[in-house]
Structure formats: C-alpha cells, structure tokens
Regions:
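Ubiquitin-like/PB1-type beta-grasp interaction modules and other compact soluble beta-rich domains
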Residues: 1-80
Length: 81
C-alpha cells in the first residue's frame, strides 16, 4: 500500500510517499511497524494525538482496519479561519 506523509510528518520522516509491504491489521499496527523501522519514524509517530489519518482519502482513526486499503495518509490536524 502507498503511505503518504504531509507537513511536519513528511519533514521528520524525510520522504513524501513510500510503498509499504505490511501484515498490519489496523492503522495502529502499521504505525507500530513503521516506528520499529528507524528512529525517524519513531520520532514522527511519538504522539498520535497530534496526528490524523486518512484511508483512501477519507478521514479515519488509528483503530480502523486496513483490509482493502490502497492508500494511508498521515498529517497534522488542520485549522482554518
């Protein structure tokens, strides 16, 4: 599946997108796999309350299943005015 990183998440990880082979069942499982890869992922995903996730371009949560998902995007909460 494709994993996309936006804003400061992209800055901390150092890439905007990657294709990931995973056995993760939920988004949280995927995050744990990524954090175990390298320190830069652990830093980016240290505080999940500061992150939002979208699955196939629909806002979701970290307990959501990944079955059938083709794209996961991580980004900080948006503010508007």
């Amino acid at each position: 599946m494709d994993v996309l990183y936006f804003a400061w998440v992209r800055e901390r990880i150092g890439i905007p997108k990657e294709t990931v082979e995973t056995q993760a069942v939920t988004v949280h499982d995927l995050v744990e796999e990524l954090k175990a890869r390298e320190e830069r992922y652990a830093v980016a995903f240290a505080d999940l309350s500061a992150l939002r996730v979208a699955l196939d371009q629909e806002l979701s949560d970290f307990d959501a299943p990944l079955s059938g998902v083709r794209e996961v995007a991580f980004f900080p909460p948006m503010t508007g005015g």
